[in-house]
C-alpha cells in the first residue's frame, strides 16, 4: 500500500494518469464506431505515421507535437479520401500508408546517431514522455469527443450502421467521418508517446471488442467500452509501476485479459 501511495507523489506519474485516462476514454469512444465500420486498423496505420513524423522531428531537433499532429491529421484525412473515392479498400489504404510511414521512420532513425533511446520510447512508450502540454491537449480532446457524443449521438449512430440511410435523411456523412478521423488522429498522437507506436491501436480495438462481447445495444457498448478502457489503463499503469514493466505492453495485457474473461463469461452463460 505504501508503494502505491508513493507512486502518486511523483508529478510525472500524475501526468501519465491524467493523460492516459483521458486518451483511453477518447480511444474507446471513438473505437466503437470505428470497429463497427470495420475501420479499426486506422489506429495502427496512424501510429506508424506518427512514428515517422516524430522520428523526423527528433532528428531535426524540432518539438514533436507541432510536427506530428498536422502530419497525422492530414494522413487520417488522406486515408478517408482514399477509401471514399478510389477502388482501394480501407485495409489496403491503411497498409500502404502504414508501411510507407514506418519505412520513413526506420530510415531516418538509422541515418541519425544517438537516437536509440528516443526510438525505443517511440516504439514501446514511456511514462516520462508526458508534459503539461500533453495534459492540456488531452483535456481539450476529451471535451471534443464528449461533445460529439452528447450533441450528435443519433447522427453518429446513423453513420455507424448505415451511411446510405444517414445520407438520405440529410446527415452530412462526410463531415462526421472527417470529424471521427481527425479526433482519432489526435488521440493516436497523444497516446502514442506513452503507449508506443506498436501498441496504441489496442486502446481503440480492445475495449470496443470486449464491450461488444458482453452487450448488444450501441449505447450500452459505448458506455461499457469507455469504463473498461479507463479501468484497464489504470490497472495497467499501476502494474507497470509496481513490476517495472513497460506501460504500453502492461496496459495491452490487461485489456487482453479483460477480453478473454468476457469471452469466457459469455461461453459459460450460453452453456448454462
Residues covered by each model-derived region:
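C-terminal binding/interaction regions
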Residues: 3-9, 123-127, 228-265
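Short loop segments and helix-boundary regions at transmembrane helix junctions
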Residues: 32-115, 211-223, 240-243, 266-268
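Membrane-interface capping segments at transmembrane-helix boundaries
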Residues: 154-155, 264-272
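Transmembrane alpha-helical segments in multi-pass inner-membrane proteins
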Residues: 198-249
Amino acid at each position: 500500500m505504501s508503494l502505491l501511495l508513493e507512486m502518486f507523489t511523483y508529478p510525472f506519474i500524475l501526468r501519465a494518469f491524467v493523460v492516459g485516462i483521458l486518451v483511453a476514454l477518447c480511444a474507446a469512444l471513438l473505437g466503437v464506431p470505428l470497429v463497427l465500420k470495420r475501420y479499426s486498423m486506422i489506429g495502427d496505420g496512424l501510429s506508424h505515421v506518427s512514428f515517422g513524423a516524430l522520428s523526423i522531428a527528433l532528428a531535426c531537433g524540432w518539438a514533436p507535437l507541432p510536427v506530428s499532429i498536422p502530419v497525422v491529421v492530414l494522413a487520417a484525412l488522406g486515408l478517408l479520401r482514399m477509401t471514399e473515392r478510389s477502388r482501394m479498400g480501407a485495409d489496403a489504404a491503411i497498409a500502404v500508408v502504414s508501411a510507407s510511414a514506418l519505412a520513413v521512420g526506420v530510415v531516418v532513425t538509422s541515418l541519425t546517431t544517438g537516437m536509440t533511446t528516443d526510438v525505443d520510447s517511440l516504439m514501446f512508450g514511456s511514462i516520462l514522455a508526458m508534459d503539461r502540454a500533453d495534459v492540456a491537449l488531452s483535456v481539450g480532446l476529451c471535451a471534443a469527443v464528449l461533445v460529439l457524443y452528447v450533441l450528435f449521438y443519433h447522427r453518429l449512430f446513423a453513420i455507424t450502421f448505415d451511411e446510405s440511410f444517414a445520407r438520405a435523411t440529410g446527415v452530412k456523412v462526410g463531415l462526421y467521418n472527417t470529424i471521427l478521423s481527425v479526433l482519432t488522429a489526435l488521440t493516436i498522437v497523444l497516446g502514442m508517446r506513452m503507449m508506443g507506436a506498436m501498441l496504441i491501436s489496442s486502446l481503440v480495438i480492445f475495449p470496443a471488442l470486449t464491450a461488444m462481447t458482453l452487450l448488444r445495444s450501441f449505447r450500452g457498448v459505448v458506455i461499457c467500452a469507455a469504463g473498461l478502457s479507463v479501468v484497464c489503463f489504470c490497472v495497467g499503469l499501476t502494474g507497470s509501476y509496481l513490476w517495472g514493466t513497460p506501460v504500453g505492453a502492461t496496459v495491452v495485457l490487461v485489456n487482453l485479459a479483460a477480453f478473454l474473461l468476457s469471452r469466457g463469461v459469455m461461453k459459460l452463460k450460453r452453456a448454462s
